[in-house]
A protein has these predicted regions:
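His/Glu-rich zincin catalytic helix
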Residues: 1-63
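Phenylalanine-focused residue identity feature
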Residues: 34, 62, 69, 106-108, ...
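M16/MPP (pitrilysin/insulinase) zinc-metallopeptidase core fold and M16-derived inactive scaffolds
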Residues: 41, 45-97
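Generic preference for flexible, low-structure residues
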Residues: 50-52, 68, 92, 101-103, ...
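Histidine-acidic residue clusters that define the catalytic metal-binding segment
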Residues: 144-159
Length: 159
């Protein structure tokens, strides 16, 4: 079997950033999958499920309610390796096109107060596994270390 595209990226060189993982074509429609990489693979600890889960609920809520991008959001969710998340958007985009959106989203997570949307037994299959404080900490870290002064090498996969 051939390797899938996401495992052909050199994870030794990969740093936190926003990357186009793939583009899929459904007729004349394009779906862009973004790799929202938050930690350096195999260099620093992965994120725990509780903070990733809290982040997933907050990010999905923010994205689906966004005025411009909300109707284009197909999916937001964590990577199995727990080093980042995937965002799927309807449309043909490049990483630079969503830096503003991702910055707004992580500011929303960093500044969030109150009950996490959907964090109840009725709404979620694992609602007790959430850590808002760590989600906020990781959002702030990503903003400061990556998004607020993002460089070109954090927008294009390494060779």
């Amino acid at each position: 079997m051939k390797k899938i595209a996401s495992v052909t990226i050199d994870h030794i060189k990969l740093q936190p950033g926003i990357y186009v993982s793939r583009k899929d074509y459904l007729g004349d429609q394009v779906i862009t999958t973004f790799d929202i990489r938050m930690t350096s693979p195999n260099e620093e600890p992965v994120m725990n499920t509780a903070e990733l889960h809290a982040m997933e609920h907050l990010a999905a809520t923010f994205l689906r309610n966004h005025t411009e991008f909300g109707p284009k959001v197909i999916y937001w969710g964590p990577m199995g390796c727990r080093t980042g998340n995937y965002l799927l958007l309807a449309g043909d985009y490049e990483s630079k096109d969503i830096v503003g959106l991702i910055t707004e989203m992580f500011e929303f997570i960093r500044d969030f107060e109150g009950e996490i949307p959907g964090a109840s037994a009725k709404d979620c299959g694992n609602y007790l596994d959430m850590n808002l404080n760590m989600a906020k900490y990781l959002a702030d870290k990503y903003l400061k270390e990556v998004l607020y002064d993002i460089k070109e090498e954090r927008l294009v996969y390494p060779e």
